[in-house]
Amino acid sequence: MAMASLAISVLAFIVSAATLWLSHLYRGKLQMTRPTVVFFGPDGGASGNPKIYLRTLIYATARRGIVLENLYVRLRRGETQQNFNIWVYGERDLARGSGLFIGQEGIATNHHFLTPNDVNGFDFAAGEYKLDVFGKIVGRNRVSLLSSIDLKIDAQEAEKLRQPDHGIYFDWGPDAARYQTKIEARRASPMDQLKLLETLRDGATDPTAQPIS
């Protein structure tokens, strides 16, 4: 009887310790689902700055959640690579990325990434691409690689992308288990660029903004 009581007490202690660790001590990881859609092309408006857009669910494996400090993408093609480090996110209301709390349930939203101001353009030429998504977590020195996505643009698609206002969509096809491409001309309204610039300048939500994907 005494041994049974001791075993129950030890088991209860282990369960309590595990619960404490999972709830308060375990820092967990930041993860993301495979993006359902990825876009390469102009951001809309007169300047036509290169942009990468994707939609995904970002979530934390820890119960206490994680604070995401920054998110950016790196696009590689052969020996060429370019960081798209200006991060804007949201559905109808766009906000400049400047910290976001991510819980276990995650946040599914649109993410827009633009090149730095000192980059005049980026040629989405034909070739095989690798799109890496990185997240910087508050309190951790290293950035985390959240996803690495393989994409391809053929010669015919690259030629179309050189036309003004044209972009390429990569839509995930679950049956084919690969991304399917679609070229579209994007006729953005003159206000789109202004709204995006206001969001980048103020670092706050623009309540009148519309999706720029």
Task: Give residue ranges: language-model regions.
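Contiguous beta-strand segments within globular domains
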Residues: 42-61, 66-72, 103-115, 177-194
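Terminal connector regions
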Residues: 116-171
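Beta-strand elements of well-folded, non-transmembrane domains
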Residues: 58-62, 75-79, 135-139, 155-157
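Extended low-complexity, serine/threonine- and proline-enriched intrinsically disordered segments
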Residues: 69-86, 132-135
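Extended, solvent-exposed segments with strong compositional bias
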Residues: 84-126, 134, 138-141
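Acidic, serine/threonine- and proline-rich intrinsically disordered appendage/tail regions
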Residues: 150-213
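Low-complexity, acidic Ser/Thr/Pro/Gly-rich terminal tails and inter-domain linkers that flank the onset
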Residues: 22-48
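Membrane-embedded hydrophobic alpha-helical segments
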Residues: 1-27
